[in-house]
Amino acid sequence: MKTLPVLVLSLTLLTVFSETSPILTEKQAKQLLRSRRQDRPSKPGFPDEPMREYMHHLLALEHRAEEQFLEHWLNPHCKPHCDRNRIHPV
């Protein structure tokens, strides 16, 4: 029972007086965040830019919808319906 407080006290003193303290100063934390952000490439999925992956997905969907629309309207086999010169597209 006496060994538990002694163990806790010794671990506390060890972490405080050695340079391996798990508590960082504000300056060290900001520097760590800055260096980490510069080291890793900026690609979708990183917590720095959470919306970027979703925006890439939306752009791909929009591009695919536009291709399907043009493929439908420029199809030579559906002339009376798809001819923009004769019929206004709704």
Swiss-Prot record:
> Which keywords are on file for this protein?
Secreted, Signal
GO cellular component, as recorded? extracellular region
Q: Mainly resides where?
A: secreted
Renumbered to this chain, the signal peptide range is 1-18
Q: Does the keyword Lyase apply?
A: no
Q: Tell me the disulfide pairings in this chain.
A: none
Q: What name appears for this protein in its UniProt entry?
A: Uncharacterized protein C17orf67
**Which species is listed as the source?**
Homo sapiens (Human)
What is the organism lineage in this UniProt record? Eukaryota, Metazoa, Chordata, Craniata, Vertebrata
